Amino acid sequence: MNLIDRQQALALGRGLRLDWEPRKACHVLLYAGGIIELNASAGWVLELLDGHSTVATVIDRLAQRFPNVPGLEEDVLAFLEVARAKSWIE
């Protein structure tokens, strides 16, 4: 069961910044205490969270970018639940 509201607009948590780390070729979350390296799919999801687009819109954009990926919606929702639990998003 997913607890993320598809009509909600999410954004990065306070004090976090999403950036690209060219030396490691990955997205990273920067915060006052350090850095979190993200896998590619986490970076793609987080870069779409602008505080205005709904979760449903983010999923639609990802589905357009990556057509025919089975379980994409469920995977995105599961990731967002984890990200919210870690206070990466609000």
From Swiss-Prot:
Pathway: Cofactor biosynthesis; pyrroloquinoline quinone biosynthesis. Keywords: PQQ biosynthesis. Signal peptide: none annotated. InterPro entries: PQQD (IPR008792), PqqD_bac (IPR022479), PqqD_sf (IPR041881). One of its GO terms (biological process) is pyrroloquinoline quinone biosynthetic process. Functions as a PqqA binding protein and presents PqqA to PqqE, in the pyrroloquinoline quinone (PQQ) biosynthetic pathway. HAMAP family: PQQ_syn_PqqD. Belongs to the PqqD family. This is PqqA binding protein 2. It comes from Pseudomonas putida (strain ATCC 47054 / DSM 6125 / CFBP 8728 / NCIMB 11950 / KT2440).
